[in-house]
Amino acid sequence: MADNLHWVGTWTTSPAPAESGAFSNQTLRMTMRASLGGDTVRVRISNAYGHRPLDIGGACIALRDAGPAIIGGSERKLSFGGEKTATIAAGAVLFSDPVALGVAPLADLAVSLYLPGEIPNDFQVTGVTHGRPTISRRRVISPRQR
């Protein structure tokens, strides 16, 4: 991807306490409606209010179908500096590498993050009062076992 792209935010929200309590080795899927469209996307993941490092074991973005379901063929794996996994220090933010994905204005998107290890009760997710992230009981994006 070209380094001279001009990025514009299309969706944001405030951190809010997770209502699911502690969990481990789960995929967290967040859905959102993009206000603007485009043909290239990247994702900003914040650990700005975190008290410990946040490990990302895998991530993807896709066009959302209905509920937590995604539109087949639209899923794009995300990388961070060319790597499939990343650790975000407490108080830091991380941007994914850009990926090609055609997003129409007002399109619904789904971002999935595989969070390996133990996630404590004080974990905060982004969301609005009635916009709840889905926590999968399966490791949808977990690394393959060799």
Spans of model-derived segments:
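N-terminal secretory targeting modules
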Residues: M1-R146
